[in-house]
From Swiss-Prot:
It comes from Paracidovorax citrulli (strain AAC00-1). Gene3D superfamilies: Nucleic acid-binding proteins. This is Translation initiation factor IF-1 2. It is found in: Cytoplasm. Residues 1-72 form the S1-like domain. Pfam families: eIF-1a. Its main location: cytoplasm.
């Protein structure tokens, strides 16, 4: 599946489930089960109930998603792509 087909949404984690899965409520009220993406798992990014997250969903199965970013309070809306390093 190409990346252009993915749907990106925002939501908040309502429940932490076993096996690195989370129940997420989207901003439009829809609930789904999401898992952490590979880089988040690799770098041990912790996600707790109440965290605001960005996630990707397939248009073919809107009940599952992959968490791609955890928004920190007091930061901007998403990952910055400024190459100032």
């Amino acid at each position: 599946m190409a990346k252009e087909e993915l749907i990106e949404m925002q939501g908040s984690v309502t429940e932490v489930l076993p096996d690195s899965r989370f129940r997420v409520t989207l901003d439009n009220g829809h609930q789904l089960i999401a898992y952490t993406g590979g880089k988040m798992r690799k770098h041990h990014i912790r996600i707790l109930a109440g965290d605001k997250v960005s996630l990707e969903m397939s248009p073919y199965d809107l009940t599952k998603g992959r968490i791609t970013f955890r928004h920190l309070p007091g930061r901007g809306p998403g990952p910055s792509s400024s190459g100032s390093r």
